[in-house]
From Swiss-Prot:
Active-site residue list: Y231 (proton acceptor)
pH dependence (record): Optimum pH is 9.0-9.5.
Pathways involved: Antibiotic biosynthesis; tetracenomycin C biosynthesis
Quaternary assembly: Monomer. May form oligomers up to homohexamers.
Enzyme Commission identifier(s): 1.14.13.200
UniProt-recorded name of the protein: Tetracenomycin A2 monooxygenase-dioxygenase
Cysteine pairs bridged by disulfides in the record: none
Higher taxonomy: Bacteria, Bacillati, Actinomycetota, Actinomycetes, Kitasatosporales
Transmembrane residue ranges: none
Cofactor(s) listed in the protein's UniProt record: FAD
Length: 561
């Protein structure tokens, strides 16, 4: 049996795995993905795409494609102000006694989606069944090999790589793949995680649920009271748990398709007992619309849980997405977190594989993403509990949605001059501090608008003030000496980037000759308040530390808090 060699093997072809293949390909890294299912999902989950995830998709040229596949998410008040446009969805969560009584519905959550000052893009609504093919096609176009109906039967890992047994499920043929690294994006139950013996912490299983995708014309019923989620009383049906604190949930999927969810006790009722007709009747009862024509398109059982892996790395193997963290769907954080895991890991693997970074850079994947994954899981748990049982204690623990999605921060060896007590701050602080994503400022280039967020992608970026032209020579020298792509962009002055609104220095807090060092994933790695005497030496020292090449000590300003 021949052995195929590949730099990175990805197990799991959901949103996280496909994103990993795409982002690795963006950085020029060959990879192979194997997925046991026959194709991308037909299940309708993970519809809400955060502005941060949209930024990542924008970075690989997919923003317009996603926008064309789904409606824009807007604030409820804004939607009403605009006359309730059909091509927009208000992000509103309500609780009602039935769809026949929406005029008395109570608004549970109506978060602000005003991210124009934070991001060059915004949240959109695009279900997993539509997003996965988009990611797959772009990853393949960029050179990734993606094999569905193919599973990893077993693997062994050693100090130099991973050896995996791969099975083509259509033919039964076995083959061997030798990879430098393995990304386990193989879901909640993650055989890879279990094989490695990585344990998890959290609340564990919350309950067994049934999700029913159905088609029904509810346009007139919900007219003027549109929502993304509506909590309804559980119908008095055999097998449906009658717990007042756990209601049924109705969620919009698209114009005339909806997802209805309820909990059941598997000790008393098996999933097979929920036939299409029975599910349709449960939906009619819960909505209070006994004559509603319902076409059940799919019903699937699933387990709601709250768990975070205690480690994201074991030698040459990395956990990502649901394999690393899983939580209730409240907040729409799950898929976004998995895509962001993949984005964080991809540039680091690329740097190590290309020989421009030391292996210790890969340790920063866990240093950065594990605290975020655990904190986001906790925020989803808090939201889930708060929506069902409001309390002042839960309100105090709750973080605003855009803060969880965009405002988080990293503390790691790849962030210099800053350390933070927790990954999600109490308020937005996108001001150019190390560990945060670069603040969004609209700049001008060649007569067009470009965001500071758009300037990275496949290289480090030095973003300097208008009198920081000398950073260009420093960046060029360091790039040549280290063999690392470093682009320099003085903003204003004689540079190609203009600051038409005069917002750059005020937003970043830089002096006119200071600079930010931005990582390929868009996060600030280091900042210099002023141009140092030896700009090239300071920049080189910073990059060597970030890339785990030496223990040099760069200048810059230390930040805490």
């Amino acid at each position: 049996m021949s052995t195929e060699e590949v730099p990175v093997l990805i197990v799991g072809g959901g949103l996280t795995g496909l994103s990993a293949a795409l982002f690795l390909s963006q950085h020029g890294v060959s990879c192979r993905l194997v997925e046991k299912h026959r194709g991308t999902t037909v299940l309708t989950r993970a519809s809400g795409i955060s502005s941060r995830t949209m930024e990542l998709l924008r970075g690989v040229g997919l923003e317009r494609t996603v926008i064309e596949r789904g409606p824009k998410l807007v604030e409820g008040a804004r939607w009403r102000e605009l006359g309730q446009p059909a091509d927009q969805i208000p992000w509103v969560v309500i609780r009602a006694n039935g769809l026949h009584d929406l005029e008395n519905a109570v608004t549970v959550e109506e978060p602000s989606l005003d991210v124009g000052h934070l991001s060059p893009t915004r949240p959109y609504w695009c279900g997993q069944d539509r997003l996965e093919p988009i990611l797959r096609d772009e990853a393949v176009r960029r050179g990734a090999r993606i094999d569905f109906n193919t599973r990893m039967e077993a693997f062994t890992a050693d100090e130099s790589g991973v050896t995996a047994t791969i099975v083509d499920q259509a033919t039964g043929e076995q083959s061997t793949v030798r990879a430098r690294y393995l990304i386990a994006a193989d879901g909640v139950r993650s055989p890879v995680r279990e094989t490695l013996g990585i344990t998890r912490t959290g609340h564990g299983t919350i309950g067994n649920a049934m999700s029913v995708l159905f088609k029904a014309d509810l346009r007139d019923t919900v007219k003027g009271r549109r929502f993304v989620i509506c909590y309804l009383p559980n119908p008095d049906e055999p097998g449906v748990l009658q717990l007042p604190e756990v209601p049924a949930v109705l969620q919009l999927f698209d114009e005339d398709r909806w997802i209805f969810g309820f909990f059941f006790d598997p000790r008393e009722t098996s999933p097979e007992q929920f036939t299409d007709e029975r599910c349709a009747q449960i939906i009619r009862t819960a909505t209070g619309l006994p004559g509603l024509p319902v076409e059940v398109q799919m019903a699937r059982p699933w387990e709601m849980s709250h768990n975070s892996a205690r480690s994201y790395r074991s030698g040459r193997v990395f956990l990502a997405g649901d394999a690393a963290h899983v939580h209730p769907p409240a907040g729409a954080f799950g898929a976004n977190g998995g895509i962001q895991d993949a984005h964080n890991l991809a540039w680091k693997l690329a740097a190590v594989l290309k020989g421009t970074a030391g292996d210790a850079l890969l340790d920063t994947y866990e240093q950065e993403r594990l605290p975020i994954g655990a904190a986001v899981a906790d925020q989803a748990w808090i939201r889930h509990t708060w929506r069902l049982n409001d309390s002042e204690e839960l309100r105090r623990a709750l973080r605003e949605s855009t803060l969880v999605a965009t405002g988080y921060r990293y503390t790691s060896d790849a962030v210099l001059g800053a350390a933070y007590p927790e990954p999600i701050p109490a308020a937005h602080d996108l001001t150019g501090r190390p560990g945060y994503r670069v603040p969004h400022v609209w700049l001008g280039r060649g007569g067009e608008r470009v965001s500071t967020v758009d300037l990275g992608g496949d290289a480090f970026v030095v973003l300097a003030g208008p009198d920081g032209g000398e950073w260009q020579a420093a960046a060029d020298k360091v790039a040549q000496d280290l063999g690392v792509p470093v682009h320099c962009h003085p903003v204003g002055g004689d540079g190609q980037l203009t600051d038409p609104d005069g917002a750059f220095l005020g937003t970043t807090g830089l002096t006119r000759n200071g600079a930010l060092l931005i990582r390929p994933d868009g996060f600030v790695a280091w900042r210099a308040e002023y141009l140092p005497e030896d700009a090239a030496g300071e920049l080189r020292s910073a990059l060597e530390r970030i890339l785990a090449r030496t223990s040099g000590t760069p200048g810059g300003t230390a930040l805490e808090g």
